[in-house]
Amino acid sequence: MHFEAEESKEVATDVFNSKNLAVQAQKKILGKMASKSIATTLIDDTSSEVLDELYRVTKEYTQNKKEAEKIIKNLIKTVIKLAILYRNNQFNQDELALMEKFKKKVHQLAMTVVSFHQVDFTFDRNVLSKLLNECREMLHQIIQRHLTTKSHGRVNNVFDHFSDCDFLAALYNPFGNYKPHLQKLCDGINKMLDEENI
């Protein structure tokens, strides 16, 4: 009996994969430390400014600091985990193809966000909400094999908030309280587009 236990340990060692272990460790560590302050060291300055502005507008809209922190923390964790999976070549060909589609969809979303702000009377909350939900579905498919149900819940938490038509209508209201936030968000997104980071 004791011999069988040792033998099974050897078998387990044969399938040991340090690369997978490293990716798991990175995901676990970053999952624990992916707060807004830590993420600023892992995310460039422009992205950090956009995240900060998303936090401010979310906090003001929800009137709930804790909820705003949770949404932005979930966004940061998702972005970081996605980057780790991508950089460590964890995606298969189908997932890589989907990742390319996802990048294009996010780029389209960014262009639409800015365009709706810059061109008067073009804003359509249903268009933005649809784009956000298309991004959500692609993201779920990309991470399906790799991340936990909890991570999928984080994705939903983020997209449930940002794709909410009432939130989008408030954000884009030309006479509303969020106009300065939208201006800063669009400035940051424009910069990210110029730097080809989105």
Curated annotation (Swiss-Prot):
Lineage, opening ranks: Eukaryota, Metazoa, Chordata, Craniata, Vertebrata
Molecular function GO terms recorded: cysteine-type endopeptidase inhibitor activity involved in apoptotic process
Pfam families named in the record: DUF758
Functional note: Acts as a negative mediator of apoptosis. Suppresses the TNF-mediated apoptosis by inhibiting caspase-8 activity but not the processing of procaspase-8, subsequently resulting in inhibition of BID cleavage and caspase-3 activation.
Localization per record: Cytoplasm
The protein's name: Tumor necrosis factor alpha-induced protein 8
BP terms from Gene Ontology: apoptotic process; regulation of apoptotic process
PANTHER family to which the protein is assigned, alphabetical: TUMOR NECROSIS FACTOR ALPHA-INDUCED PROTEIN 8, TUMOR NECROSIS FACTOR INDUCED PROTEIN
UniProt record similarity statement: Belongs to the TNFAIP8 family.
InterPro entries assigned to the protein according to its UniProt record, in alphabetical order: TNFAIP8-like (IPR008477), TNFAIP8_sf (IPR038355)
Coiled coil: 49-83
